[in-house]
Design a protein with these regions (language model features):
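Formylglycine-dependent sulfatase
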Residues: 1-376, 380, 384
Length: 384
């Protein structure tokens, strides 16, 4: 999303706890081009792209002691985060279930993690914390409303005459599932459903702030997600007869549609027709070229190499269909899928990252695929 380039071109998987930044200092990001064009830029919430822990780790600390709070100098600058990648301002918690568990503003720690988390008990809605340092007052239920409030404070400071770009990365509905009490029971689909309802409420607060500030008519808002539901979706299927992936097979980490097909909702008054729907296959990597076109930033051929311009799609204008010849999808190392029109080719014996549960297969009328398959080919129109 931030680079216009598929992550598998550089690495597979995710940045783990205590990993360094996935970015090189001269990497292209959309925040950098907004900043160059005079926009104020801010990021709030999750930053699951690594930090420079070496910069704050005390000399001579053994790897097995990385989880200890005393292994770090929390008063030092914490580099490698959003403010090194084009954002003027950042407030967030890094990653909700990865240490350190504390608030970070720009490149400094606001709350100091002093107590250790050795083993976390599962929270009521599901999910745990990885071992590592935690601030004494840390409460996971505060994270979603706090990051939203900080984003609203920043937005309310903006003037209609000063362009701005905000990247608001909610922790919800990622593990741990921590909906606040006022949302309990709202969804009738357990704590996960309630967490989704709370997320919707936070999005609503952002839209209201734009309206009250006189910014809504000239602000492009995009709402999306990074992957499908976690594996607790199987339990919700049994408990509530609710399947988070809709009519699609798969959950997070699967290369089936349910693993990566996500919402993509756009609002831009006067530019995009309200209620319009497109069935064009698009990707979040397309935002880079799209944003560059909107702000008049010329991109070189060596950056945002996987990105396509979505403007004609969003505006309902004529364009050569399809937008792209094919879309490449990837999950674990060596497991890829190629989407072309209604067809999906999975270059693996199964699109699942783990054994699929029997009750799930039976309820959705699916079959498990054996390890001897050389690959799988689906027509999504006939077999979603």
């Amino acid at each position: 999303l931030l680079t216009g380039q598929h992550h598998w071109r550089r690495f597979h998987g995710i940045a783990q706890a205590y990993d360094g930044p996935v970015f090189q200092p001269d990497d292209f990001t959309i925040a950098k081009i907004f900043k160059e064009k005079g926009y104020r830029t801010a990021a709030f919430g999750k930053w699951h792209l690594g930090w420079d822990f070496d910069a704050i780790r005390k000399p001579g600390v053994a790897k097995e002691d990385w989880v200890k709070a005393e292994s770090y100098d929390w008063n030092k600058r914490f580099p490698g985060g959003p403010t090194d990648q084009g954002f003027d301002h950042y407030f967030g918690d890094g990653t909700i279930n990865f240490p350190p568990y504390c608030w970070i503003e720009n490149d400094r720690f606001v709350t100091i993690p002093t107590k250790p988390v050795i083993k976390s008990e599962p929270l009521a809605g599901g999910g745990t914390f990885r071992p590592g340092p935690m601030a004494e007052s840390w409460n996971p239920y505060d994270i979603l409303p706090t990051m939203t409030e900080k984003a609203l404070e920043w937005i309310n400071e903006q003037s209609p005459d000063q362009p701005f770009f905000v990247y608001l990365a909610f922790n919800s509905p990622h593990y741990p599932i921590v909906p606040n009490k006022e949302f309990h029971g709202k969804s009738k689909a357990g704590y996960y459903g309630d967490f989704v309802i709370e997320t919707d409420a936070m999005v609503g607060r952002v839209l209201i702030a734009l309206e009250k500030g006189g910014l809504a008519e000239n602000t492009l808002v995009i709402f999306s997600a990074d992957n499908g539901a976690e594996t607790h979706a199987f339990e919700r299927l049994e408990a509530f007869d609710q399947w988070s992936s809709g009519k699609y097979r798969g959950v997070k980490r699967d290369i089936y549609e349910g693993g990566h097909r996500v919402p993509f909702i756009v609002r831009w008054p006067g530019q995009i027709e309200a209620g319009a729907v497109s069935d064009e296959v698009v990707s979040q990597v397309d935002l880079a070229v799209t944003f560059a076109d909107i702000i008049g930033y010329p991109l070189g051929s060596d950056v945002a190499i996987d990105s396509y311009n979505l403007l004609p799609v969003l505006k309902g204008e004529d364009y050569d269909r399809p937008l792209r010849t094919a879309t490449v999808q990837n999950t674990s190392p060596g497991k890829f899928a190629l989407r072309q029109g209604d067809w999906v080719l999975i270059d693996a014996s199964s699109g699942a990252a783990r054994k699929e549960e029997k009750h799930y297969l039976e309820r959705l009328g699916l079959e498990a695929y054996g390890e001897r398959n050389e690959g799988l080919l689906f027509n999504l129109k006939e077999d979603p």
